[in-house]
Design a protein with these regions (language model features):
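ABC family nucleotide-binding domain
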Residues: 2-160
């Protein structure tokens, strides 16, 4: 079953077209790489998926929920803020330049977002944080500070 379906995405900044008729289908659990030269629109395309950028045409469907679609008149219609919010809470994105809080441990860096964004309590977050850190192979580093980790380890913390 298709999990992410981005069809015929168009994106312009002023009169500059940066995405023209770009499509992507991903199945649940599938690992996909988007490659291309610098400035080719890879990050913009992903920002459109994460609703960090609006689209000027096309459609975006995630897990069966239509986030954006273009009608016959060329107008892009978006899902309600509530629908977008609920779906985006289940998504994550690691940016090319990611930042961890240097004064916080690995575990604290993992726990802060669910605490601040979702209002979760630490006893709810702790088992999830342990599972995520185990998944990226960093549970044993949970009490370390980012400066003590390699760049790759820091990126894995950001992914978790």
């Amino acid at each position: 079953m298709t999990f992410v379906n981005m069809e015929r995405i168009e994106k312009r900044f002023n009169n500059q077209t940066v995405l023209r008729d770009v499509s992507l289908k991903m199945n649940r659990g599938e690992i996909v790489s988007i490659i291309g030269p610098s400035g080719s629109g890879k990050s913009t395309f992903l920002r459109c998926l994460g609703q960090l950028e609006t689209i000027d045409g096309g459609s975006i469907t995630v897990d069966g929920t239509v986030l954006a679609s273009t009608d016959a008149n060329g107008t892009v219609n978006y899902a309600s803020q509530e629908t977008q919010h609920d779906l985006l809470l289940r998504m994550g994105m690691v940016f090319q330049s990611f930042n961890l809080f240097p004064h916080m441990t690995v575990l604290d860096n993992i726990m802060i977002a669910p605490r601040m964004v979702k209002g979760m309590k630490d006893d709810e977050i702790s088992p999830i944080a342990e599972q995520l850190l185990n998944k990226v192979g960093l549970w044993e580093k949970r009490n370390m500070y980012p400066s003590r980790l390699s760049g790759g380890q820091q990126q894995r913390v950001a992914i978790a």
